[in-house]
Amino acid sequence: MSDDDHHFESSADAGASKTYPQQAGTIRKSGHIVIKNRPCKVVEVSTSKTGKHGHAKCHFVAIDIFNGKKLEDIVPSSHNCDVPHVNRVDYQLLDITEDGFVSLLTDSGDTKDDLKLPADEALVKQMKEGFEAGKDLILSVMCAMGEEQICAVKDVSGGK
């Protein structure tokens, strides 16, 4: 055996799962669920009683947290569903580039330059107007299943 046999390529992903299992019957409204491989927020849950052949079923109506599309799924209540790990992180806005990207300041003092402006026109307008007025803006970034998107803007200027 040579040393090459024990060599592996490291990647940025540490191999942590992007989802965790949860029994369908325990997922509630305003929780999260993966439907059609998309992270969603549950807006409605209804349960049907056990029928002649089998399990009680949970009917989930959910909204994709990144694109706002409505998705539905029906799962036996005793089965496990994938639930995404959803995180929200706040960053300070440093710059908005011409090509539609933002430059953000992380807690550790580094810059994060790989995030595009969101599709929400009102949010983009709020960001651009605040930035041009010289306000200190904090952007909330939602992260789930390897995707990131700006979801909120806060002005922390303090009466400038």
Curated annotation (Swiss-Prot):
<protein>
    <recommendedName>
        <fullName>Eukaryotic translation initiation factor 5A</fullName>
    </recommendedName>
</protein>
<feature type="modified residue" description="Hypusine">
    <location>
        <position position="52"/>
    </location>
</feature>
<comment type="function">
    <text>Translation factor that promotes translation elongation and termination, particularly upon ribosome stalling at specific amino acid sequence contexts. Binds between the exit (E) and peptidyl (P) site of the ribosome and promotes rescue of stalled ribosome: specifically required for efficient translation of polyproline-containing peptides as well as other motifs that stall the ribosome. Acts as a ribosome quality control (RQC) cofactor by joining the RQC complex to facilitate peptidyl transfer during CAT tailing step.</text>
</comment>
<dbReference type="InterPro" id="IPR020189">
    <property type="entry name" value="Transl_elong_IF5A_C"/>
</dbReference>
<dbReference type="InterPro" id="IPR014722">
    <property type="entry name" value="Rib_uL2_dom2"/>
</dbReference>
<feature type="compositionally biased region" description="Basic and acidic residues">
    <location>
        <begin position="1"/>
        <end position="10"/>
    </location>
</feature>
<keyword id="KW-0385">Hypusine</keyword>
<comment type="similarity">
    <text>Belongs to the eIF-5A family.</text>
</comment>
<dbReference type="GO" id="GO:0003723">
    <property type="term" value="F:RNA binding"/>
</dbReference>
<dbReference type="GO" id="GO:0003746">
    <property type="term" value="F:translation elongation factor activity"/>
</dbReference>
<dbReference type="InterPro" id="IPR048670">
    <property type="entry name" value="IF5A-like_N"/>
</dbReference>
<dbReference type="InterPro" id="IPR008991">
    <property type="entry name" value="Translation_prot_SH3-like_sf"/>
</dbReference>
<dbReference type="InterPro" id="IPR019769">
    <property type="entry name" value="Trans_elong_IF5A_hypusine_site"/>
</dbReference>
<dbReference type="Pfam" id="PF21485">
    <property type="entry name" value="IF5A-like_N"/>
</dbReference>
<dbReference type="GO" id="GO:0003743">
    <property type="term" value="F:translation initiation factor activity"/>
</dbReference>
<dbReference type="InterPro" id="IPR001884">
    <property type="entry name" value="IF5A-like"/>
</dbReference>
<dbReference type="GO" id="GO:0045901">
    <property type="term" value="P:positive regulation of translational elongation"/>
</dbReference>
<dbReference type="InterPro" id="IPR012340">
    <property type="entry name" value="NA-bd_OB-fold"/>
</dbReference>
<dbReference type="GO" id="GO:0045905">
    <property type="term" value="P:positive regulation of translational termination"/>
</dbReference>
<dbReference type="GO" id="GO:0043022">
    <property type="term" value="F:ribosome binding"/>
</dbReference>
<feature type="region of interest" description="Disordered">
    <location>
        <begin position="1"/>
        <end position="23"/>
    </location>
</feature>
<keyword id="KW-0648">Protein biosynthesis</keyword>
<keyword id="KW-0396">Initiation factor</keyword>
<dbReference type="Pfam" id="PF01287">
    <property type="entry name" value="eIF-5a"/>
</dbReference>
